[in-house]
UniProtKB/Swiss-Prot annotation:
HAMAP family: NaMN_adenylyltr. This is Probable nicotinate-nucleotide adenylyltransferase. Disulfide bonds: none annotated. It comes from Carboxydothermus hydrogenoformans (strain ATCC BAA-161 / DSM 6008 / Z-2901). The gene is nadD. Its EC number is 2.7.7.18. One of its GO terms (biological process) is NAD biosynthetic process. Pathway: Cofactor biosynthesis; NAD(+) biosynthesis; deamido-NAD(+) from nicotinate D-ribonucleotide: step 1/1. Catalyzes the reversible adenylation of nicotinate mononucleotide (NaMN) to nicotinic acid adenine dinucleotide (NaAD).
Length: 201
């Protein structure tokens, strides 16, 4: 019996917002996945400044995902004492899900940088990639990178189209600091949690 097709969606999620959910939904439907696992990073190697605690980010993800049975959140990276790298996470998840097909989900911006990641070239050969188009990266540049990685590393890449949504976690943090409206950019449960815990101020 064939295993499940599971997408791995890592990030800071600082905080999780509607753009993350749209990206995951598009990847889920277009790549015909059975499940998407959100994996918040404990110590993002490239985002050390302004990252709130893993407990807050994990709880916000749980609240944001509770309506979606096909989505789950894992604390696998929180259990490490060292910075979290995608390659290490994929290695661990392959051991945890030996009978399933794992896919790594990334945006167009991540795809442009992936060969510079820790063991990024090996990652391309280890797991199929679901690459999602994203505002800020032109379609031509995105598709050229897809073709380059396929040719250079024989990477398996599934291209997913996504509506342009100009939402980022940094935008939300900025709006909170500047006391501008932001509730329309995140799930209501996440908004309530941020307010209740006085985060990002």
């Amino acid at each position: 019996m064939a295993g499940a097709k599971i997408g791995i969606f890592g990030g800071s999620f600082n905080p999780v917002h509607l753009g993350h959910l749209v990206l995951a939904r598009e990847a889920f439907w277009q790549a015909k996945l059975n499940q998407v696992i959100f994996i918040p990073a404990k110590i993002p190697p490239h985002k050390k400044e302004g990252v709130i605690s893993e407990q807050h980010r994990f709880q916000m993800l749980r609240l944001a995902l509770k309506k979606y049975p096909e989505f789950s959140v894992s604390n696998i990276e929180f259990l490490r004492d060292k910075p979290s790298y995608t390659f290490d996470t994929v290695e661990e998840l392959k051991l945890l899900y030996p009978h399933d097909e794992l896919y790594f989900i990334t945006g167009a911006d991540g795809l442009l940088e992936i060969t510079g990641w820790y063991r990024g070239e090996e990652l391309l050969k280890k797991i199929p990639i679901i690459a999602v188009s994203r505002a800020g990266v032109s379609k031509e540049v995105f598709l050229n990178q897809v073709q380059y990685l396929k040719n250079r590393y024989r990477a398996q890449i599934i291209v997913v189209e996504m509506p342009e949504i100009g939402i980022s976690s940094s935008l939300i943090r900025q709006r909170i600091r500047e006391k501008l409206p932001y509730s329309h950019l995140i799930p209501v449960e996440v908004y309530d949690y941020i307010v209740a815990n006085n985060l990002y101020r």
